[in-house]
């Protein structure tokens, strides 16, 4: 995906503040899975954002002897810095959990550093962390910042676990802890296979993020034993009727019995056109994306009744809501569980107390780890995998039809 991939993830990592931080976010923001969208062009990491002064951490918390850096945007773009502060709060909450539990060793001290909203800021913060002597870097948040900080960390031989949702920025020693497009698609196509569906197809927007989803769909469908029936792309919603007209003969011949429509901006339109064409959910299972999870209007649309979509199990976020509100006020954003999980992971005895700490073979343990969002695994190529649940839109609301017990 190259630069395009970095761009969709950079803009994408901003959109979810509308639901979680609605009072402080621009009205145009809407919650999507773990991803965010603001009109912010270019891949240069922030268009004029000032590099923060990185001579000293903004804050330190924890009482352990192993130094770990947490790089987050705490200045610059208002929405991004608000999210960054919320993730810092979630990390503090995790440290508080460690300190309050006598059965958990206090192994780490977190040094919180500001990346601002630019790649240059991430480079500066990472360099300062290296000079400080940290053994692990958590963050930063956006794809181009992970790339920038990752270059510094890799040169210093320090592993980095970033929070971008774009797997193209991952690599040996630079991990991304987030729900990636391939993770969503793998969970969704395996569920279809388990349900006896045999002819998956997909409709994707001609955008960098849409291209990432389409590529993941093809790869994961083949890996699950499918031969994808068709992959359609569109540049404008005005093309929707033409795509349905092309798909209808394949549906009638039984070649398409499941249809991915992950783009929440167009999903209801495609579902409505299918219904007008006489296609029922019994004939074709509609499948969305984790981006649907917090779009209340979309989930109430009758045209999407019966549709399924992969999602992060909400139990983890619900488990920290009360403590977060009591300590910091307000509700934690969906991404709070990522920072919380990363902090707990950094404190794990077998990782932090190893010699040397955080070796690649330890971080990529095939058994994976149990995080706030359920099971997850890091791979040698830097990508991650999550055990997602499957949700279904029912007449009485959203129900979980398959759990995330395995990856």
What are these regions (language model features)?
Residues 159-161, 168-190, 231, 301-313:
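Short beta-strand elements at the ligand-binding edges of bilobed clamshell
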Residues 20-45:
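Bacterial Sec signal peptide processing site at the extreme N-terminus
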Residues 176-233, 329:
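An alpha-beta-alpha
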Residues 327-402:
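Segments of small-molecule ligand-sensing domains
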Residues 1-23:
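N-terminal secretory signal peptides
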Residues 256, 268-340, 354:
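Extracellular/periplasmic periplasmic-binding protein-like sensory domains
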Residues 85-86, 101-168, 267:
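Beta-alpha junction/loop-to-helix N-cap segments that form part of ligand/metal-binding clefts
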Residues 129-141, 161-163, 201-204, 254-266, ...:
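Periplasmic-binding protein-like
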